[in-house]
Amino acid sequence: EGKGSQFDPDIAEVMLSMIDEDEDYNMRQVEKMVSNILVVDDEKINIRLIENICKNEPLYKVIAAESGKQAIDIVGNQQIDLVLLDIEMPDMDGFQTLEEIRKITDVPVIFVTAYKDYKLIKRARQMGVEDYITKPFLPIVFLETLYGVIG
C-alpha cells in the first residue's frame, strides 16, 4: 500500500531504446522532407530577400548561386528539389542556364524575373519551366507558388 507501480527494469530499458530509435527515425524523416531550393540570381539582395521569406519555412533550405555556371555546378553535385532562376544574368542568362541544368536533371524550375513579356513566358513554358514569378512580388504570392510546385 502506498507504493506506485514499477516497470520491470529490463522492459523499461527496451522501451526507452525504442523511443530513442523512434526519435532518430522521425528526425531522418523530417530531413528527407526538407526541400533544397537553389536560388540563382546575380543580385545578392534578391537572394537575401528569398532567404528571409523562406527562413520561417522549416522544410525549405535555401542554397544560393550568383551565376548560371555556379548553379550548374551545384545542381551537378547536390540534391536540389527546386531551382528559382533569374533570367537576366551576366555570364549566362536564365535560358542558357536552364538548358545546361536540363542536361543534368529534370528538377522543377521557376523563373523569378522582372520581365513581364508574354513571349518570354511562353518560351519558358515551352522549355519546361514550372512557373514564373515577376519581381517585385509579395511574399505570400511567392510562397504559394513554391507550395504549388514542391508542396
What are these regions (language model features)?
Residues 1-32:
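Histidine- and acidic-residue-rich, metal-dependent catalytic cores
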